[in-house]
A protein has these predicted regions:
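N-terminal export leaders
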Residues: 1-2
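Low-complexity, Ser/Thr/Pro/Gly-enriched N-terminal "stalk/linker" regions
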Residues: 5-63
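Short amphipathic alpha-helical segments that mediate assembly, nucleic-acid/protein binding
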Residues: 9, 13, 17, 30-33, ...
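Residues that form generic nucleotide/phosphate-binding pockets
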Residues: 19, 23, 35-40, 146, ...
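Intrinsically disordered, low-complexity segments enriched in polar/charged residues with Gly/Pro
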Residues: 33, 97, 320-323
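Aromatic-lined, polymer-binding surfaces characteristic
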Residues: 37-277
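Extended polysaccharide-engagement surfaces of secreted carbohydrate-active enzymes
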Residues: 230-371
């Protein structure tokens, strides 16, 4: 992006943070806040039911501390909430953030400390900027400094992981008005939107992650969530997604990603290890990505509106489908779409990798695939 003058830069940071707040706006029910407060330790700012020493790789227990402070922050800053402007709740947020900084919980799964935790902290701090009282500058600064030190660097990762780390770089850059970090983060969001023979968007319009694994769903979900999210934040600014990147993204989403979803359910062949998760084929929540794209890629807005109607259940699974047969020569995957049915074939191939297992997920189907 072109350099901005001081006034323009200030306005852009405020605009980006306003869009981020709108994206995550929530009004936590008072009952949930009251339940969380029952286990709040007034002495040190911890929660008595959270195991801060746990390092388990999935459903990491200490993250509950951040999730509760996150809800407290939105309750404190949301007009109409019974805790809006509540000074006692504000004091608990401050003490809770101080406790988290001093305790510095660590997870054996890097994802929690480099993606989940810093993303939530960034959003929370952006929201708290709207409060009647501001958290101490020293507390905000040291929290953000640790996020920068321990939260990873997007350039060291690929695909969805790169985008997810870049997101909290964006949050931190807005809070600190650091144009260099903001530019780096945006580059790392947009740079993966290229055709490659490595991990990422393939020349046949499929998507690979973790080597040569077909991951149209799973990691495909994540990278689309992150890219469309950032593209909406930067829409109408000098940081907007480049047109050629938007075209590649839209082609993948319209012709591959949403083509593997029948009605609201995704074909299981493209889900990776996530196939073992309950109700994972239900992709109705991905209507959000299509809604974003209808605004970003207005030339194909009607196509996205049809996708949204199918995912929301307002139209049947056949609505606006055009018969199409596609063989993905990089993925060794075939997709056949008709108004009345859809089927796919994922081939046994030496050019691709079979579905993985990891983080306690998918050991059974991985073993069966080996048989």
């Amino acid at each position: 992006p072109a350099p901005a003058n001081s006034s323009q830069g200030d306005n852009e940071y405020q605009l980006l943070m306003k869009k981020i707040r709108q994206d995550f706006a929530v009004n936590p029910p008072a009952k949930e806040i009251e339940e969380a407060l029952k286990t709040y330790n007034e002495t040190d700012g911890s929660f008595t039911d959270v195991d801060y020493a746990s390092i388990q790789r999935t459903n990491w227990p200490p993250l509950l501390h951040i999730d509760r402070l996150y809800d407290f922050a939105f309750a404190y800053t949301t007009p109409g909430n019974s805790y809006y402007g509540n000074e006692a709740l504000f004091d608990k947020i401050v003490k809770g953030l101080e406790f988290w900084y001093e305790r510095n919980p660590w997870c054996h799964n890097w994802w929690y400390n480099q993606i989940a935790e810093p993303q939530r902290l960034g959003i929370m701090l952006i929201q708290l900027r709207t409060g009647k009282k501001q958290i101490p500058a020293e507390l905000e600064t040291k929290t953000l400094d640790r996020v920068r030190k321990d939260g990873g660097h997007p350039a060291k990762w690929t695909g969805a992981n790169r985008t997810d780390i870049a997101l909290h770089w964006i949050y931190r850059a807005c809070l600190t008005q650091n144009e260099e970090d903001l530019a780096l983060a945006l580059d790392n969001v947009y740079n993966p939107i290229v055709y490659t023979t490595k991990e990422g968007f393939q020349h046949d319009n499929s998507y690979f992650q973790h080597g040569r694994q077909l991951y149209i769903g799973g990691y495909g979900d994540e990278i689309l969530k992150g890219i469309t999210q950032v593209a909406m934040y930067t829409r109408g600014t000098r940081f907007a997604i480049p047109e050629e990147k938007l075209a590649l993204l839209s082609k993948f989403m319209r012709e591959t990603y949403y083509a593997t979803i029948r009605g609201r359910h995704m074909l299981f062949d493209v889900l990776g290890r996530g196939v073992s998760r309950p109700k994972i084929t239900d992709k109705s929540h991905t209507a959000l990505f299509a809604r974003r794209m209808a605004q970003l890629d207005t030339a194909h807005a009607a196509e996205y509106e049809a996708i949204i109607a199918r995912l929301d259940g307002k139209e049947n699974a056949a609505h606006a489908l055009v018969p199409k047969h596609t063989h993905y020569y990089r993925a060794d995957y075939t997709l056949h779409v008709r108004p009345h049915y859809t089927f796919d074939v994922r081939m046994v191939s030496t050019r691709t990798a079979r579905c993985e297992y990891g983080n306690g997920e998918n050991p059974v189907s991985y073993t069966h695939l080996r048989a």
